[in-house]
Amino acid sequence: EIRFKATKVIDFLNLTHLTQELAGNLSGGQKKLLELGRTMMVDAKIVLLDEVGAGVNRTLLKDISEAIIRLNKEKNYTFFVIEHDMELISKLCETVIVMAEGSVLYQGSFDEVKSNEAVIEAYLGRGMIQKNNLNS
């Protein structure tokens, strides 16, 4: 039963070509896909991902992103993503929570967050708000 489930997880994540490799020999991105596979094996429906894009090449990041989106849509997984890559956040997250100094600064859609003055000021400085207002 476990072997059958593992085979399904490996297929879902397109990792069949790596089944003979030791985890220690995998690249950073491949290890992150393997971590997703581990969550699938225990059927963890709520998953915390910390800097999923860090140290991962764009090709593997696309594979990881697609796997996260599929797990959310097809298997009803919920992901909490801690990430600084805003492009990645825009692809993965329906709701974005921005924190500053340990407190929630703003919560909303990606588009709402990226245009929120408090967020812009906290992360880019007041000059960016003035520049954005001049360009509007």
Question: Where do the language-model regions lie?
Answer:
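H-loop/switch region of ABC-family ATPase nucleotide-binding domains
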Residues: 83-84
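A short, surface-exposed alpha-helical micro-motif characterized by mixed small hydrophobic
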Residues: 89-91
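Helical segment within the ABC ATPase nucleotide-binding domain
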Residues: 62-74
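Catalytic Walker B motif of ABC-type/P-loop ATPase nucleotide-binding domains
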Residues: 47-50
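Conserved ABC ATPase "signature" region
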Residues: 1-18, 66-69
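Conserved ABC ATPase signature
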Residues: 22-26
